[in-house]
């Protein structure tokens, strides 16, 4: 190689290295089935989360964070695409055995599961868009949309459907519970190759099975609380320990200053004394299902603040893309928060939206078929409307079609329905919901007359 070629190679390689260094690494941490109250930094009197406490203290912390749909797969698909469930068509965890879905499969020659997964091909994904911008990426933990490659990740753990066990993570579900080696190896390789990386860390924690290490369980059974509750509390601390390991590795590699770390939960979970979860938590449109703290941490770039504004998980994708200098293909419904995270200025938004559907999808091409609730929060007030979608195998369904209006500041448990006393506010907030979108074929204020079978109810306990 002559001197000119050596010079050109060095120049090009040097420019690429500078390009890589200017792009932040991105770490998205997703906990699984955890209440917004169940952290030390959120005021829980018993659960210890020292590593998340430290992260929150170094971050922009949104205590009023929300996911628009409080169920595993829809929540994760929103984080993968930046879109609402009614936009990306992943409204539930699995396709239901319905005439509509049978008709779709007969026409296409594909299974309903495959047709559902194909939505990730149609709308694209955060990993794909970041890949177009020069990122390498790794999937670990929960992932429903086929293999990690199909999700646009360059590396990963999940084999996915139609592989055996490939419903929602298979080998990926080992991360955290069985160590952190795959994640650490990916980080080490990315740093050695001088490539910016995106890490999807979605451990199956504190999700069931609640089988924490005995050393943690002993801490929480000592006070005489019910065993099911003690196990859940210990699982929350176990999750925290894995996050501590991850953050230590990032610090030890000397890349913390150039790494944007984001934390969010897929949905809430209020632990019942005898096992399982309470009604107004996972799957529900209430605070116990949809609310969770959202954290953005990037030392020297994101201003440390305890932020009072509303935040939604829909903001995460556009914010990540902006930080990475990558343009996505959609007009995302969420906000790019990066300018306000850097400046510390107030986010000029006081309204966010959400929707809840049946656990199983009645019509994989029509999201409204399974629509059960829509909600809007404006300031401190929340309006919740019911709809007459097919409940399928829902564990809990609405008992009434009455509008529900709550003052979340005065009544965070949503016990006092103010709708009858404030018809004008109900009307105003209903108008906002219909400006958001009108669900064709569904009627607000009604509930489905269809009953789920005993077999379906047992399946989803």
Task: Please give the residue ranges for each predicted region.
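Beta-strand elements within well-structured catalytic alpha/beta cores of enzymes
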Residues: 23-35, 54-55, 79, 130, ...
């Amino acid at each position: 190689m002559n001197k000119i070629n050596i010079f050109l190679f060095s120049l090009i390689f040097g420019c690429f290295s500078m390009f890589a260094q200017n792009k932040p690494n991105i770490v998205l941490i997703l906990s699984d089935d955890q209440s917004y109250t169940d952290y030390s930094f959120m005021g829980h009197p018993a659960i210890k989360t020292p590593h998340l406490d430290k992260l929150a203290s170094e971050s922009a912390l949104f205590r009023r964070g929300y996911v628009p749909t409080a169920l595993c797969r829809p929540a994760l698909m929103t984080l993968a695409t930046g879109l609402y469930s009614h936009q990306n068509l992943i409204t539930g965890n699995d396709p239901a055995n319905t005439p509509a879905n049978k008709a779709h499969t007969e026409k296409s020659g594909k299974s309903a599961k495959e047709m559902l997964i194909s939505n990730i091909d149609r709308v694209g994904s955060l990993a794909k868009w970041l890949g177009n911008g020069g990122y390498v990426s790794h999937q670990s933990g929960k992932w429903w949309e086929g293999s990690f490659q199909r999700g646009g990740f360059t590396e990963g753990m999940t084999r996915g459907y139609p592989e055996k066990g490939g419903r929602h993570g298979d080998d990926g579900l080992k991360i955290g519970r069985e160590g952190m080696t795959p994640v650490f190896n990916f980080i080490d390789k990315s740093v050695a190759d001088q490539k910016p990386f995106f890490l999807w860390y979605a451990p199956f924690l504190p999700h069931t099975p609640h089988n924490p290490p005995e050393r943690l369980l002993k801490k929480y059974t000592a006070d005489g609380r019910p065993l099911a509750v003690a196990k859940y509390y210990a699982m929350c601390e176990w999750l925290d320990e894995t996050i501590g390991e991850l953050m230590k590795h990032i610090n030890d590699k000397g890349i913390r200053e150039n790494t944007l770390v984001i934390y969010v939960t897929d949905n809430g979970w209020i632990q019942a004394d005898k096992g399982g979860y309470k009604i107004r938590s996972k799957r529900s449109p209430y605070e116990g299902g949809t609310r969770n703290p959202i954290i953005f941490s990037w030392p020297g770039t994101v201003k440390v603040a305890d932020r009072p504004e509303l935040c939604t998980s829909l903001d995460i994708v556009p914010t990540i893309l902006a930080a990475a200098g990558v343009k996505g293909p959609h007009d995302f419904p969420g906000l790019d928060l990066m300018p306000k995270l850097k400046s510390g200025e107030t986010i000029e938004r006081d309204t966010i939206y959400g929707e809840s559907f049946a656990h199983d999808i009645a019509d994989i091409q029509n999201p409204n078929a399974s629509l059960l609730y829509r909600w809007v929060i404006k300031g401190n007030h929340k309006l919740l409307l019911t709809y007459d979608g097919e409940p399928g195998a829902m564990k809990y369904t609405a008992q009434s079609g009455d509008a529900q209006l709550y003052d979340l500041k005065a009544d965070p448990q949503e016990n006092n329905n103010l709708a009858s006393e404030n018809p004008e506010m109900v009307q105003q907030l209903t108008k906002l919901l219909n400006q958001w979108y009108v669900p064709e074929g569904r009627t607000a204020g009604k509930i489905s007359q269809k009953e789920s079978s005993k077999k379906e109810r047992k399946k989803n306990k």
